[in-house]
Amino acid sequence: MITVYSKPLCHYCTMAKQWLEQNGFAYEEIRVDTNPEARQFLINEGHRTMPQLYHKGKLLVEGGGQALVRLDPKHVKELIGEVDVGDIQL
């Protein structure tokens, strides 16, 4: 599952979550305004902007929501290890 670190009233956060939903990706949203541990984690990782997208503790894509929506959903599936059988060519 993808973890989306977000904050309220963030256009890019909304855009990223909509893209994930439209392309069938499950995600967990963690709001940094109500979760000080998450906010500190992102600061320690060097992030100052939202959203930040992680999968299994690793940054999924540099550039947050803007970068995510430019990716092909198949590429994101490869990044998180969710390759459909129909996508595999023998």
Q: Where are the model-predicted features located?
A:
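Short intrinsically disordered terminal tails
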Residues: 1, 89-90
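Structural micro-motif
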Residues: 45-54
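Short acidic active-site motifs
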Residues: 37-41
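Local sequence-structure signature of Cys/Sec-based thiol-disulfide redox active-site neighborhoods
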Residues: 1-25
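Non-catalytic, surface beta->alpha helical segment in thiol-disulfide oxidoreductase systems
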Residues: 55-89
